[in-house]
């Protein structure tokens, strides 16, 4: 693992009072743990490959736009923001617009969802607006798929990752935004 991943693992080990070796072991794909060489893994194109060069434009209402601008002002520094709204209130549109701004700066975006079954619909929502490489990462994927995504993130071939908690351990090279959707969900604690 590289120095940035080691920093994340050291932090997680300290914060959760968990042995460093086990944190590192949990952060690595199983192929790496088993010593399978990267060259032995055939890399497939992602199932969520770009679909269209024509994307819809994100139109925010006044309240959404105000929230977007407030978060955008602080996006270059480490800061946290909470967007509170019921399902269907337009939080995703704000996320999309923030992600587009971050990607313009050649940064990657991580979107954490509480359940595996939310990844396909979240990917679909983002693909409507963003014509970039969007991939998922969660325990329901094959080992080959997870390793491919892990390598794509490491090689900065992915713009947006949508996944469950374990996706925080992906080896991002230029992470510019983390969105935790439904952060109140107990599966994210």
Where are these regions (language model features)?
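Accessory, non-ATPase domains that flank or precede helicase/AAA+ motor cores in DNA-metabolism machines
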Residues: 1-164, 168-189
């Amino acid at each position: 693992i590289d120095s940035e991943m080691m920093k994340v693992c050291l932090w997680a080990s300290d914060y959760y009072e968990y042995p460093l070796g086990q944190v590192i072991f949990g952060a690595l794909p199983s192929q790496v743990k088993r010593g399978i060489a990267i060259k032995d893994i055939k890399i497939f194109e992602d199932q969520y490959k770009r679909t269209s060069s024509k994307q819809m434009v994100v139109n925010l209402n006044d309240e959404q736009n105000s929230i977007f601008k407030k978060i955008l002002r602080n996006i270059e520094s480490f800061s946290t923001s909470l967007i509170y709204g019921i399902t269907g209130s337009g939080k995703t549109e704000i996320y999309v617009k923030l992600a587009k701004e971050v990607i313009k700066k050649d940064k990657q975006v991580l979107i954490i969802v509480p359940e595996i079954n939310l990844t396909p619909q979240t990917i679909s929502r983002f693909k409507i607006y963003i014509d970039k490489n969007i991939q998922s990462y969660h325990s329901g994927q094959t080992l080959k798929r997870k390793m491919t995504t892990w390598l794509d993130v490491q090689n900065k071939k992915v713009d947006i990752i949508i996944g469950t908690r374990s996706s925080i351990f992906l080896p991002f090279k230029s992470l510019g935004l983390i969105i935790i959707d439904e952060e109140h969900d107990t599966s994210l604690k």
